[in-house]
């Protein structure tokens, strides 16, 4: 018989490594910046372990795998080792890791516990019980296989010998080689016998094997005469035996008597140079496979997501009854379904979570999805259902059309929840759940804003007080105190010096004039624009006097409280793009002017760093879900009058990355299109750089009848008869407002889909009329929606229209150039969006325009603060008013947020409580802790 063919593991492993190197390059081309990651955790300092690890690190480097070696001391305890295992499990840059065995520690460590703490999806050694169990069950495509058996199988396949139907004998039953080798051969359809130290007549059992794999750790235990002629022999052993002919006095042999066996076998592995190189190659292959699985799971593509099926009832139950009839998915599960990593999600219980900004950094190279903004016609006081339409649309796109889709909505103020409004999270079968969480504290963002805002207010009045009661020198000594004999400026004080043109860093080097300029802000109390805030409707805080305690030495002034969401910090949160950007915006917030007319900022007050600390968690978007299980970001809730009325840029950006290029992100703009949509485009999109693909314009028969001359609609009172009976004439006359809002949207170059939010009293004839007129006047489409009563199914036609519109050509453009004067920018909005003949800047507004321009704020975008109940400044004028001049009473600046807001009329920033507030109905069941009466 001819000598056996040599199975050279070095040659085969080199081929595998070259293939892996190509695969790594391909992954990096698909996802720039991505690198497969391998970590090796070692305890102790065994020489043999060090040798093996160095071989693995070198192989990883050659292939392009980022390998990390974590070496713990011999004093490590089991709990310390487990902490490292857990941290590697949570590290998204590590796609596979191994614990180098044996664990060389002075302390007793349960090796099995350490191995089984490894996340199975990162267990590239294939040693966890879960991977071993999957291998035993034959789930070869859903597990990692121990590297040595996997390498042995590759060598067997190299022979060309068919495994299926052959009799394979495995000598050895270790968890690392023998046992998994048995399973691997079995599921490759061999008939397998496993032999071990208790096997009788071992030589006879070995002689039956067409394929023989030996892993006993006994030098040359298997003799040549035992081997069946023509067998394939795989020798996994590495043993050292004495050899006087070798320089070190020993040689390496396998578990098989090689010289004898090669005369009987058809193929045989040498030792060394056989199985050893394959083990390392298979570790690299498993790491690359793990990285590929990671990419497949987390790169944009169709989500594998479970939707909730609605149990629709007629008549439609109350919002809270519907909300409680649907059990939300665990928010951690939803996060995984949409491609978020564990370390990118901070859970707040089972139904809400914060998403870290690191997700945006990870996905920065991924293309964005389609961007849809939901707005409406000029509403009745009852609202026309923008929020409900937003949620219904995403439920339709997700649960019914199986598109990746995200809703991005504002967080409601808690004040109105207990006042006149009650809860708000959509309605009917189109809601965000749980509604109790949505409407109350959520994750504390508004509380953080309240704390930050009031810290600024306290800093302003304290600074005025201290400047009035101290000399320059005393003030300077307290601002820059000597600590242990050393006096130095803080970082924020250094920045103030630079703004003043003072380049010195030694406090002792300042002149008297420089001390005066540095220490005194010289705030003019009459110019203070910063107010304290509270997230409670309290009319008696609309005007207050502060400083009446004797300790304030008579330094009183008139001030007020606003509701928390009216704070500029809320607008900053909504418009910021990163933690660094938020820090800069908070510092830029102007709170007053000095007596010389210079703007005083939070950076001047020295408080901007502290504000950032208070807001560090609030910047992370809040993840919730709809009734049908689609994801929702609830983040930021600025007023839609004195601010821009849109949810956060950060939430939109993360969502656009997560849905991928074929997915949709649907966000809502407050009030009608003339206010919320205009600000969405000219402020939010200007700062974000994002370009919307579709405008969804919500309209109701009810609102059109009002604009057509119908009776007054009053919140809390029954609708007049005209609104519950068919009246085509009123609808057609009122269409003028919808026509104008379609025109407004198209002015920005974006396709418009009209969503006719249907009520049970609306007739098909009325809805058909609205649809026809909308299409005739430039709408891409107009569709009837019944999502309040039917959930996503009721918005299916709308979703399909949005899909089509997103493919239509668009040419997005902003309305005005920032370089124009403040007056000209206001005029463009008034004339083009509202239909005014002109504007009139009243004296105070004229003065402010000049001051802000002089202070360098004239190039900010404009955020008009006017009534949402009319296109004009008069809420009683419905339809499309003409022939009016828009009066601008005042202009104020939100410099940190980044806009000027002209006041048209009087804007209330602190709601009051009605005679019968909603809190009469709100209570808690002490046994179930269920909130009652919120909706």
From Swiss-Prot:
Q: Where are the annotated segments for Methylenetetrahydrofolate dehydrogenase and methenyltetrahydrofolate cyclohydrolase (D/C) domain?
A: 2-291
Quote the cellular component terms of the Gene Ontology held in the record. cytosol
Q: How does it assemble?
A: Homodimer.
Q: Where in the cell is it found?
A: Cytoplasm
Q: What does this protein do?
A: Trifunctional enzyme that catalyzes the interconversion of three forms of one-carbon-substituted tetrahydrofolate: (6R)-5,10-methylene-5,6,7,8-tetrahydrofolate, 5,10-methenyltetrahydrofolate and (6S)-10-formyltetrahydrofolate. These derivatives of tetrahydrofolate are differentially required in nucleotide and amino acid biosynthesis, (6S)-10-formyltetrahydrofolate being required for purine biosynthesis while (6R)-5,10-methylene-5,6,7,8-tetrahydrofolate is used for serine and methionine biosynthesis for instance.
Q: Which residues bind ATP?
A: 380-387
The molecule here is called C-1-tetrahydrofolate synthase, cytoplasmic
Tell me what reaction this enzyme catalyses.
(6R)-5,10-methylene-5,6,7,8-tetrahydrofolate + NADP(+) = (6R)-5,10-methenyltetrahydrofolate + NADPH; (6R)-5,10-methenyltetrahydrofolate + H2O = (6R)-10-formyltetrahydrofolate + H(+); (6S)-5,6,7,8-tetrahydrofolate + formate + ATP = (6R)-10-formyltetrahydrofolate + ADP + phosphate
| Residues where Phosphoserine is found | 318, 413, 490
Q: Give the EC number(s) listed in the UniProt record.
A: 1.5.1.5, 3.5.4.9, 6.3.4.3
Keywords for this entry? Answer: Acetylation, Amino-acid biosynthesis, ATP-binding, Cytoplasm, Histidine biosynthesis, Hydrolase, Ligase, Methionine biosynthesis, Multifunctional enzyme, NADP, Nucleotide-binding, One-carbon metabolism, Oxidoreductase, Phosphoprotein, Purine biosynthesis
* Modified residue annotations for N-acetylmethionine: 1
Stretch list, region Formyltetrahydrofolate synthetase domain: 310-935
Q: Name one GO biological process term.
A: neural tube closure
Describe the family membership recorded for this protein in Swiss-Prot or TrEMBL.
In the N-terminal section; belongs to the tetrahydrofolate dehydrogenase/cyclohydrolase family. In the C-terminal section; belongs to the formate--tetrahydrofolate ligase family.
Family annotation (PROSITE patterns) = FTHFS_1, FTHFS_2, THF_DHG_CYH_1, THF_DHG_CYH_2
Kindly list the positions annotated as binding NADP(+): 172-174, 197
Active site located where? 56
Q: What is known of its domains?
A: The N-terminal methylenetetrahydrofolate dehydrogenase and methenyltetrahydrofolate cyclohydrolase (D/C) domain carries both the methylenetetrahydrofolate dehydrogenase and methenyltetrahydrofolate cyclohydrolase activities.
Q: Where does substrate bind?
A: 52-56, 99-101, 272-276
- One of the record's GO molecular function terms: ATP binding
């Amino acid at each position: 018989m001819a000598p056996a063919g040599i199975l050279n593991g070095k040659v085969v492993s080199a081929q595998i490594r070259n293939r892996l190197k190509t695969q790594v390059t391909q992954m990096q081309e698909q996802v720039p910046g991505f690198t497969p990651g391998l970590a090796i955790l070692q305890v102790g300092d065994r020489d043999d372990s060090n040798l093996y690890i160095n071989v693995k690190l070198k192989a990883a480097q050659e292939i392009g795998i980022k390998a990390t070696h974590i070496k713990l001391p011999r004093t490590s305890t089991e709990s310390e080792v487990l902490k490292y295992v857990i941290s590697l499990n949570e590290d998204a840059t590590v796609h596979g890791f191994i614990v180098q065995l044996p664990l060389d520690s002075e302390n007793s460590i349960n090796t099995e516990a350490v191995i089984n703490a490894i996340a199975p999806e990162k267990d590239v050694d294939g040693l966890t019980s879960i991977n071993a169990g999957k291998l035993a069950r034959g789930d070869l495509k859903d597990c990692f296989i121990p590297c040595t058996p996997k390498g042995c199988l590759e060598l067997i396949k190299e022979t060309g010998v068919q495994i299926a139907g052959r009799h394979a004998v495995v000598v050895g039953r270790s968890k690392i080689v023998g046992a998994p080798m048995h399973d691997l051969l079995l599921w490759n359809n061999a008939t397998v016998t496993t032999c071990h130290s208790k096997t009788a007549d071992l030589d006879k059992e070995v002689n039956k094997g067409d394929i023989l794999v030996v892993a006993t750790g006994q030098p040359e235990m298997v003799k040549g005469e035992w081997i069946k002629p023509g067998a394939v022999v795989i020798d996994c052993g590495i043993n050292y035996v004495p050899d006087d002919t070798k320089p070190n006095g020993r040689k390496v042999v396998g578990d098989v008597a090689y010289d004898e066996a090669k005369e009987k076998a058809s193929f045989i592995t040498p030792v060394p140079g056989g199985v050893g190189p394959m083990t390392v190659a298979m570790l690299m292959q498993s790491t690359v496979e793990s990285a590929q699985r990671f990419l497949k799971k987390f790169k944009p593509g169709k989500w594998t997501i479970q939707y909730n099926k609605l149990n629709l009832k007629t008549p439609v139950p109350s919002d809270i009854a519907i909300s409680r009839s649907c059990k939300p998915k665990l928010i951690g599960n939803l996060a995984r379904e949409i491609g978020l990593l564990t370390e990118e999600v901070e859970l707040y219980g089972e139904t809400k979570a914060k998403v870290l900004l690191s997700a945006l950094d990870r996905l920065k190279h991924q293309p964005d999805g389609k961007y849809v903004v939901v707005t409406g016609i000029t509403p009745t006081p009852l609202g026309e259902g923008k929020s409900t339409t937003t949620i219904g649309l995403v439920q339709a796109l997700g649960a019914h059309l199986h598109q990746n889709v995200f809703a991005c909505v504002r967080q409601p103020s808690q004040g109105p929840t207990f006042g006149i409004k009650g809860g708000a999270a959509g309605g009917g079968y189109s809601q965000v759940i749980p509604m109790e969480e949505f409407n109350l504290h959520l994750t504390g963002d508004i509380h953080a804003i309240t704390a930050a805002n009031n810290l600024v207010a306290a800093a302003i009045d304290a600074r005025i007080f201290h400047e009035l009661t101290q000399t320059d020198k005393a003030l300077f000594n307290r601002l820059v105190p000597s600590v242990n004999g050393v006096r130095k400026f803080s970082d924020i004080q250094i920045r103030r010096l630079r703004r003043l043109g003072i380049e010195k860093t030694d406090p002792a080097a300042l002149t008297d004039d420089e001390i005066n300029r540095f220490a005194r802000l010289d705030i003019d109390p009459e110019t203070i624009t910063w107010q304290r805030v509270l997230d409670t409707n309290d009319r008696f805080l609309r005007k207050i006097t502060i400083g009446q305690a004797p300790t304030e030495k008579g330094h009183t002034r008139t001030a007020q409280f606003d509701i928390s969401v009216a704070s500029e910090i809320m607008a900053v949160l909504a418009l910021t793009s990163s933690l660094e950007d938020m820090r800069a915006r908070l510092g830029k917030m102007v709170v007053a002017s000095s007596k010389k007319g210079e703007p005083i900022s939070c950076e001047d007050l020295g408080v901007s760093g502290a504000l950032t600390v208070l807001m560090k968690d609030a910047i992370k978007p809040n993840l919730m879900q709809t009734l049908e299980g689609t994801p929702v970001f609830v983040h930021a809730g600025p007023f839609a009058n004195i601010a821009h009325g849109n949810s956060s840029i950060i939430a939109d950006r993360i969502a656009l990355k997560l849905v991928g290029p074929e997915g949709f992100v649907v966000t809502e703009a407050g009030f009608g299109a003339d206010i919320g949509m205009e600000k969405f485009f000219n402020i939010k999109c200007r700062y974000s750089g994002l370009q919307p693909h579709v405008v969804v314009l919500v309209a109701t028969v009810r609102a059109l009848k009002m604009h057509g001359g119908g009776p007054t609609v009053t919140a809390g009172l029954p609708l007049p008869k005209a609104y519950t009976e068919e009246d085509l004439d009123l609808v057609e006359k009122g269409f003028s407002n919808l026509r104008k809002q379609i025109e407004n949207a198209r002015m920005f170059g974006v396709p418009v889909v009209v969503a006719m939010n249907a009520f049970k009293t609306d007739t098909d004839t009325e809805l058909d009329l609205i649809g026809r007129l909308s299409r005739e006047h430039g709408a891409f489409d107009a569709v009837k929606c019944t999502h309040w009563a039917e959930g996503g199914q009721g918005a299916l036609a709308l979703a399909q229209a949005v899909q089509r519109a997103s493919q239509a050509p668009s040419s997005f453009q902003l309305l005005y150039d920032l370089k124009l004067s403040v007056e000209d920018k206001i005029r463009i909005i008034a004339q083009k969006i509202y239909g005014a003949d002109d504007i009139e800047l009243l004296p105070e507004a004229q003065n402010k325009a000049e001051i802000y321009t002089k202070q360098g704020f004239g190039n900010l975008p404009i955020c008009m603060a006017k009534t949402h109940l009319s296109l004009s400044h008069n809420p009683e004028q419905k339809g499309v008013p003409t022939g009016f001049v828009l009066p601008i009473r005042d202009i104020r600046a939100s410099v940190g947020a980044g806009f000027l807001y002209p006041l048209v009329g009087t804007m209330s920033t602190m709601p009051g409580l009605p005679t019968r507030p909603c809190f009469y109905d709100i209570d808690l069941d002490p046994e179930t802790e269920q909130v009652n009466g919120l909706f």
